[in-house]
C-alpha cells in the first residue's frame, strides 16, 4: 500500500497533481531501522515515511518529485527543488544548479537558486529567471539567483544541500 499526506498527515488525492510525503505499508516494509529503538520507525498504524515527496495518479502510478528535506515550503505550499534545478540546468549556459529554501518573513521559505555556469559563459540573473516563464508555476520561480564558481559535492557526486543551507541560512 502507498499514500501521500500533507503536513498535517491528511491523505491527499491520487490525481497526479497533489504531492506530499510518501508513505508505504505492507508485509515487505521494514519494521525498524538497524539499532533503532524498537517501535519507533513505523507510525502507529503501520505506515513507513520514506522521506520522499511524491505524486500518485488515478491509475496508481507514483512519481517521486523530491526528498522531504529538500522541498521548499512556501506559504503552505510545497515547491520541488528538483523541478527548479532541472529547469535551470536545461538552460544552455548553465552547467549545474542547486535550489534551497531560505527564510522569508511572509512565506516561511522561498527558493534561492545557485548557478554554476559553463566555462566561458555569461548570463544575467534576469535571463535565468525569465527562463522559468511558462515552465513552472509563477509562484515557484526563485526569488533570487546566486552565481557560484562551484557547488559542493559528496563523495558520490550528490550536491551537499546541507552545506548550502548552512552557508545561506541568513540570506
Regions found by a protein language model. Give the residues of each.
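Short secondary-structure edge/capping micro-motifs at helix/strand boundaries
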Residues: 39-40
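General small-molecule cofactor/ligand-binding pocket signal
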Residues: 145-148
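A short, polar/charged loop-to-alpha-helix boundary motif
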Residues: 167-171
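Hydrophobic alpha-helical segments, especially N-terminal targeting/anchoring helices
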Residues: 5-6, 16, 50, 56, ...
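Adenylate-forming AMP-binding core of the ANL superfamily, especially NRPS adenylation
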Residues: 1-35
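AMP-binding/adenylate-forming catalytic core of the ANL superfamily
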Residues: 20, 26, 31-32, 45, ...
Amino acid at each position: 500500500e502507498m499514500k501521500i499526506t500533507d503536513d498535517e498527515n491528511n491523505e491527499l488525492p491520487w490525481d497526479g497533481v497533489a504531492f506530499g510525503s510518501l508513505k508505504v505499508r505492507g508485509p515487505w516494509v521494514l519494521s525498524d531501522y538497524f539499532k533503532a529503538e524498537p517501535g519507533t520507525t513505523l507510525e502507529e498504524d503501520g505506515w513507513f515515511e520514506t522521506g520522499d515527496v511524491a505524486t500518485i495518479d488515478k491509475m496508481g502510478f507514483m512519481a517521486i518529485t523530491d526528498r522531504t528535506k529538500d522541498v521548499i515550503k512556501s506559504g503552505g505550499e510545497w515547491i520541488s527543488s528538483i523541478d527548479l534545478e532541472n529547469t535551470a540546468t536545461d538552460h544552455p549556459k548553465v552547467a549545474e544548479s542547486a535550489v534551497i529554501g531560505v527564510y522569508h518573513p511572509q512565506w516561511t521559505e522561498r527558493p534561492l537558486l545557485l548557478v554554476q555556469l559553463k566555462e566561458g559563459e555569461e548570463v544575467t540573473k534576469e535571463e535565468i529567471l525569465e527562463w522559468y516563464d511558462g515552465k513552472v508555476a509563477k509562484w515557484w520561480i526563485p526569488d533570487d539567483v546566486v552565481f557560484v564558481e562551484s557547488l559542493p559535492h559528496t563523495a558520490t557526486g550528490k550536491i551537499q544541500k546541507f552545506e548550502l543551507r548552512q552557508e545561506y541560512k541568513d540570506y
